[in-house]
Amino acid sequence: MHWKFSNFRKYHLSFHLNLFDLSLFFISFYCFPILYICFFNQVHSFRSTQPSLIMNKFDLFDDYSTKGSTIPLPNENFDQLFLSSEANDMEFLFNETLMGLQDLDVPSGYGIPQNTINNDFQHTPNKSKSHSRQYSGTAIFGFADHNKDLSINGVNNDLCKQSNKAINTQSVSPGELLKRSRGSQTPTPTSALPDTAQDILDFNFEEKPILLLEEDELEEEKHKQQQRMMTQSSPLKRVTTPSQSPFVQQPQTMKQRKPHKKTNEYIVANENPNSYKFPPSPSPTAKRQQYPPSSPIPYNPKSDSVGGNSYSAKYLQSLNKTQQIEYVDDIEPLLQEDNNNMKYIPIPVQEPMSYQKQKPVTPPLQSQNDSQQLEPLKTPQPQPKQQQQQQQPNNEQDKEFTANFNFNTFLPPPTPPNLINGSPDWNSSPEPHSPSPGRLQPPQQISPIHQNLGAMGNNINFYTPMYYELPVQAEQPQPQPQPHQQQHQQQQHQPELQNTYQQIKHIQQQQQMLQHQFHNQNNQLRQQHPNQFQNQNQNQNQNQTKTPYSQQSQFSPTHSNFNLSPAKQLNSNVGSMHLSPLKKQLPNTPTKQPPVTIEWSPVISPNSKQPLHKQIKESSPRRRIKKTSLLPPGELDNYWTGPDEDKIYTCTYKNCGKKFTRRYNVRSHIQTHLSDRPFGCQFCPKRFVRQHDLNRHVKGHIEARYSKCPCGKEFARLDALRKHQDRNICVGGNKNVISKPTKKKGTNNTQQQLLKTDTVVERIEKQLLQEDKSVTEEFLMLQ
């Protein structure tokens, strides 16, 4: 009789496993002899019992020492158990047992596809049909949701379906198992469990099991954290070294993580070193073999085919111990060595200093004609130490510099110490740069004249100090370039230099022509305007004493005003003597420039029949004057005469004879005779001779609505209405106002007192006539 594990479901057999039982299950699963004994014991006990009986919970994993003597122990003889009538019975039983694992969802040994290793939250495509396999944060050893179903990710439940990879269906016979167990006398350590398990249990596993050690995981996390801190702190302190991984003994990483390649990095401590030491540079011959001479040699730390530097840190430190160099600020001794193999020389930023270096004179390498053709460039010029040092390199350094860097560039003049934003230095000026050679900035190609100089050659020394003057103390004798060095450079770059020199000569000729024209025009202007130039020369001498830069900047070709229009060229050339380059604003006294005057020039058509003076008179702009008369011009002058000896004007219209002291008054008077009233009111049909009469009339229209008395009388002005009401002579008068008598002009207080006494005397006389004489006598005596 043969049985399958599917009978467990038929008879409702369930395995309630705890943590201890589960660990025993996996140990027995990897140790095949113990597992086989368990299976055989269950088969034997299941045959002897009734089918309706239910197994106890822990019968499968009971202690085998308490069982009967019929069950052999691992150290006992198994031959009596394996003897059978048929040779293939045990193999068939073992295969049936393995087939029963399908119903229990026990892992059957299919490997995880490579594309799902790094996907921690995605199930494999081969899902089980019996239950859904999901991850659980609290599940222990594959038991999802703490249920009875074993759930392990990456296991294909359907054994009937064909797998993508080849499946090894070869089983293990018990005889081979005993031979292997007898051959291994020592017990298997924990580190060898994956190999023995693979040999013993060939359950179609394609990948080796994973052995996870907590110590290795902690070391790996520390290593990754240290790498992350170093990359964040300083990327310059990472030097490639050969691979020295501390995790070589670990067979694999976690199955759900893809094993990533570790970069070969040498980690330097984040501390201040005593001195910086660099690996020795390779020989020039090796560089020439690797790279063509025209291409620049890039710096690649990972130049080996392996992907890292072949030198270790200790080896490099041991090499540098023998070659210890003290880096000092003074690099003069380093420059005097002839056979120095330094690739980069730190040049301090300071004022130019004299540097004298003698070399043996070699015979000239070029003909005399070529040297005579390039004679203008042999004139000694004040050059900084950096540029002289680059003109006289060694042979090896010269080749390396031409391949790597372009040191011979167009240098700007040295910056004076007291420059401001408006100074002629090309770094400090906010204005666009001039096209002169001394102010050229080669990377930006600003100048329209020297746009092609960058493509002519890389080893061109072009330095023309046009906008500055060196102080007397800083001028030191510089050694003249020796002829053999210049000829050596000419031989290397002869065609490029000749084209460049020709362009430079052409530019210098253009500058001379511009200066010559500029001087000629200034001389002509001096002859035409001698007074203006005398004042300008005085101001110019004052400015030159204050600014040493103004002498060379006055005749710069960048400030010639030849592109101006003819109307503005005169005044601009007059003031051009005081222009400085790029609106220089050095401390000086500002001079008043002559004002620019704009004059009106009439346009006269040649086909006109009128004479010239009439055309000019008619075409000239006139001021718009408001007409003061409607009569034709000169009509009013026919009716008046004057002024006479007394400066009096007399009206002669129809023997009027009125006399006026002003011409305006006599003309207005004649306009009244002729009814010439040009100023009309816009509110009524009245018209007036003079403008101020119209203004007074219009004011009356505006105030008429407010200047009407209740008595019915209207007034043109408000002040007239108020006077009328203050008199209190009508219904609309102000009764609360007491009218005061007006004083007559020319009367004194004494006269007024006399008048009062006269009136008093008259009243008294009238009373005396009415009364008795006695009363009057008494009254007179009292007085």
UniProtKB/Swiss-Prot annotation:
**Disordered: annotated span:** 166-195, 219-311, 355-452, 474-497, 535-624
One Pfam family it belongs to? zf-C2H2
The cysteines joined by S-S bonds are none
- Can you say what this protein is called? Cell wall transcription factor ACE2
What species does this protein belong to?
Candida albicans (strain SC5314 / ATCC MYA-2876) (Yeast)
Q: Where are the zinc fingers (C2H2-type)?
A: 649-673, 679-701
Q: Which PROSITE patterns match?
A: ZINC_FINGER_C2H2_1, ZINC_FINGER_C2H2_2
Q: Where is the composition biased (Low complexity)?
A: 372-395, 483-497, 535-544
Q: Which gene encodes it?
A: ACE2
Chief location: nucleus
Q: Where in the cell is it found?
A: Nucleus
Q: Which SUPFAM superfamilies match?
A: beta-beta-alpha zinc fingers
Q: Which UniProt keywords apply?
A: Cell adhesion, Cell wall biogenesis/degradation, Metal-binding, Nucleus, Repeat, Transcription, Transcription regulation, Virulence, Zinc, Zinc-finger
